[in-house]
């Protein structure tokens, strides 16, 4: 968040120290000699010139030191556009944010009469690598197009901390930096920049067109506002700090970061927060809902499996009406299951749609199947319906074998066999015949070795 956003970060880190610092401290002590010295520095005087200028700034007394006498000729040269333009940063800031400038550097506004403020837009686009840019792209905090004062105050605290941390990396001197703060919701572009603590009320409705312009045009408007701050009723634009060309790539980069770094800080590097977090929260709620749908599928599989296993145990435990009530639901689920491509080679409880279903199926297989095996395998005639049991099994043997050979030959899903046998109970008459058929068919499908065991067991009878 406190990264240097200029293109040449490594090289410009040292080069931007002096212009950032002196451009704001300059108007405190005269203008002519400062402009000449700035012109010479831009023309390409060396690194030692910058370091001496920095020492001079840190000492706060520019007229001391021997090198001012050496540069006596430079005091006369005063190119108006570059020197005044660069001094214009200090003047623009003192005009824009008068209270803050007065608290930090009182005599900043003394040089107001020496400046030609028409050239203020020159310093916006001249030296890119001597500037440092922080872009805070803000979204709707509450999804209603309104930004409250609490949001803005916490945002300003965050911006102060970030800029302070970034500036301390580059220089130990006291600097006044200009931060361009734009609040832009998606439907209509707005600009909102209450920077000072005295005036933090957002001026939303009056400056909605600002952000749609190009950055240089917006900066030109800023210079116009600084020329006549009393004539224009928009204090927001007067207070917009740090005239920096908003790079389109950089802006898109921050917009891309908005979806990624949601939790770095409350107002992330171009992803502040609330709407991005709400989008993230929406995605997070979609993910649990998706997982809930998977859980519901797994629950349906578990329900299907438990119904099948309940049909194993029902002759010994519960009346047959529950199995009859459960048959249409299982039949509809099996018809759904027929259409899935993963169905053919897998048993009923493991359709491959979710690991919870598999785990539940295995647990159920481990727990109730021994009882069903005891009830069904070794006790071929359940206690409630002793007489119709063999008849139902003979009918079932014929139908099941007729159904198994063509269906398995074609590689159809195993649920088709179940549906073939499901169609048998209406022909079997009373409810007593239904239960053994379902029980034996499920036995035959899931445990074919038991089927052979039953076959040999029933064959003599």
Swiss-Prot record:
Residue spans of biased composition, Pro residues class: 380-390
Residue ranges annotated for the EF-hand domain, each copy included: 127-162
Extent of Low complexity compositional bias: 341-350
Cell cycle listed as a keyword: no
Location of this chain's protein in the cell: Cell membrane; Cytoplasm; Cytoplasmic vesicle
Statement: the UniProt record of this protein carries the keyword Transferase: no
Annotated segments matching region Interaction with DVL1, DVL2 and DVL3: 121-186
Annotated binding of Ca(2+), by residue: 140, 142, 144, 146, 151
Residue numbers spanned by region Interaction with TGFA: 307-396
Lipid moiety-binding residues (N-myristoyl glycine): 2
Region ranges (Disordered): 1-106, 176-205, 263-302, 321-359, 372-414, 441-461
Family under the similarity heading: Belongs to the NKD family.
Function: Cell autonomous antagonist of the canonical Wnt signaling pathway. May activate a second Wnt signaling pathway that controls planar cell polarity. Required for processing of TGFA and for targeting of TGFA to the basolateral membrane of polarized epithelial cells.
Protein name: Protein naked cuticle homolog 2
């Amino acid at each position: 968040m406190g990264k240097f956003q200029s293109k040449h970060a490594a090289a410009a880190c040292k080069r931007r120290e002096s212009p950032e610092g002196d451009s704001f401290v300059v108007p405190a002590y005269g203008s002519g000699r400062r402009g000449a010295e700035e012109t010479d520095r831009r023309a390409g005087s060396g690194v030692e010139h910058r370091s001496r200028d920095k020492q001079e700034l840190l000492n706060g007394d520019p007229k001391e030191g021997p090198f001012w006498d050496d540069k006596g000729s430079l005091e006369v040269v005063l190119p108006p556009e570059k020197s005044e333009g660069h001094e214009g940063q200090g003047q623009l800031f003192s005009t824009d944010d008068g209270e803050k400038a007065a608290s930090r550097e009182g005599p900043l506004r003394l040089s107001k009469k020496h400046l030609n403020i028409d050239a203020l837009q020159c310093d916006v686009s001249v030296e890119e690598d001597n500037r440092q840019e922080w872009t805070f792209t803000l979204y709707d905090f509450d999804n209603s197009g309104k930004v409250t004062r609490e949001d803005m105050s916490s945002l300003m605290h965050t911006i102060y901390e970030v800029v302070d941390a970034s500036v301390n990396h580059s220089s130990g001197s006291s600097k006044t930096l200009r931060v361009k703060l734009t609040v832009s919701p998606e439907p209509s572009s707005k600009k909102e920049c209450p920077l000072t603590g005295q005036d933090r009320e957002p001026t939303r409705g009056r400056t909605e067109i600002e952000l749609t312009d190009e950055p240089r045009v917006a900066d030109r408007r800023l210079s116009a506002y600084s020329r006549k701050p009393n004539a224009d009723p928009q204090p927001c634009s007067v207070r917009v700090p740090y005239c920096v060309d908003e790079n389109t790539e950089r802006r898109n980069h921050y917009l891309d970061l908005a979806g990624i770094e949601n939790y770095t800080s409350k107002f992330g590097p171009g992803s502040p927060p609330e709407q991005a977090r709400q989008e993230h929260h929406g995605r997070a709620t979609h993910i649990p809902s998706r997982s809930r749908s998977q859980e519901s599928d797994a629950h349906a599989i578990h329900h299907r499996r438990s119904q099948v296993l309940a049909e194993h145990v029902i002759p010994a435990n519960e009346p047959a009406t529950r199995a009859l009530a459960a048959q249409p639901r299982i039949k509809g689920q099996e018809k759904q299951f027929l259409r899935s491509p993963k169905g053919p080679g897998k048993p009923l409880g493991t359709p491959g749609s979710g690991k919870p279903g598999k785990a539940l199926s295995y647990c159920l297989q481990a727990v109730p199947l021994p009882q069903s095996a005891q009830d069904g395998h070794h006790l071929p005639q359940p206690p409630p319906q002793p007489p119709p049991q063999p008849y139902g099994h003979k009918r079932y043997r014929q139908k099941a074998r007729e159904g198994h050979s063509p269906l398995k030959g074609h590689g159809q899903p195993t649920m088709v066999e179940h549906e073939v046998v499901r169609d048998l109970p209406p022909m079997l008459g009373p409810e007593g015949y239904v239960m053994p058929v379902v029980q034996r068919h499920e036995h035959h499908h899931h445990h074919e070795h038991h089927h052979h065991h039953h076959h040999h067991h029933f064959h003599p009878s």
